[in-house]
């Protein structure tokens, strides 16, 4: 069985584009849950460009599934997570100029800082995952932090148009997933996955959960949120046979 985490950031982006109260990402989360989402992912960025604390507070109190809060290792957001104690937090790198998260955490390069954040979140009864590139060096460092989960960055696989390069990137993801599993880590994956490329990743047996946002919200513009979520979940389950 493979789980689907639906990222609702882009619903909030649409709301913030006009400074209105709608569309409400909280409502989108409820629709996604009813359509088969196993978790709801939201990124509370330091600059609060889309998801805001109000969203996280309501989601943490009302979701029937799980809230996976994406966040940088930044003091203000860490305090929010400690206070609200969502089911899961995924630590990600963050730069103000980026449109979306552009790569995995350099866990090995900032091991003590990330380890401290993991310990603080664990003390708040939050399960921590680390968003990392499919690199054995980073996976070994992730294990040293005490985080029980890693999320493999699938962006290079998803964004390349070259067939040979895509196959190579998929091989790296598969190898990394196997290695992380051998270390005792739960393996999730995400970034750039859509309705055309998701099945090859969903078929990797070591991967437990995929987090997908932009493709689902974009598809929802034409077919509605419930259908968009159900379509993605169906593709994932088909890939697992």
From Swiss-Prot:
Binding residue positions for 3-amino-2-oxopropyl phosphate: 7, 18, 192, 213-214
A GO cellular component annotation in the UniProt record: cytosol
Cytoplasm listed as a keyword: yes
Compartments, record wording: Cytoplasm
UniProt site (Transition state stabilizer): 151
Matches recorded under Pfam families: PdxJ (PF03740)
Main location: cytoplasm
Family, per entry: Belongs to the PNP synthase family.
Protein name (record): Pyridoxine 5'-phosphate synthase
Encoding gene (name): pdxJ
């Amino acid at each position: 069985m493979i789980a689907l985490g639906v990222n609702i950031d882009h619903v909030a982006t649409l709301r913030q584009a006009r400074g209105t109260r709608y569309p409400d990402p909280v409502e989108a989360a409820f629709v996604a849950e009813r359509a088969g989402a196993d978790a709801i992912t939201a990124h509370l960025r330091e600059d609060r460009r889309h998801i805001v604390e109000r969203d996280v507070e309501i989601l943490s109190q009302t979701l029937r599934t799980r809230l996976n809060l994406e966040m940088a290792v930044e003091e203000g957001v860490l305090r929010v997570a400690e206070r609200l104690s969502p089911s899961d937090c995924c630590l990600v790198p963050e730069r103000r100029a980026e449109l979306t998260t552009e790569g995995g955490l350099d866990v090995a390069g900032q091991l003590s800082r990330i380890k401290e954040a993991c310990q603080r979140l664990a003390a708040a009864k939050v399960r921590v995952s680390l968003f990392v590139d499919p690199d054995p060096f980073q996976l070994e460092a992730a294990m040293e932090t005490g985080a029980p989960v890693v999320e493999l960055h699938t962006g290079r696989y998803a964004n390349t148009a070259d067939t040979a390069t895509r196959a190579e990137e998929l091989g790296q993801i598969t190898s990394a997933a196997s290695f992380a599993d051998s270390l005792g880590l739960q393996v999730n994956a995400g970034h750039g996955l859509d309705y055309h490329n998701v099945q090859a990743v969903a078929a990797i047996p070591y991967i437990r959960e995929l987090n997908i946002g932009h493709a689902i919200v974009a598809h929802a513009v034409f077919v509605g949120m419930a259908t968009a979520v159900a379509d993605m979940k169906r593709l994932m389950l088909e890939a697992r046979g």
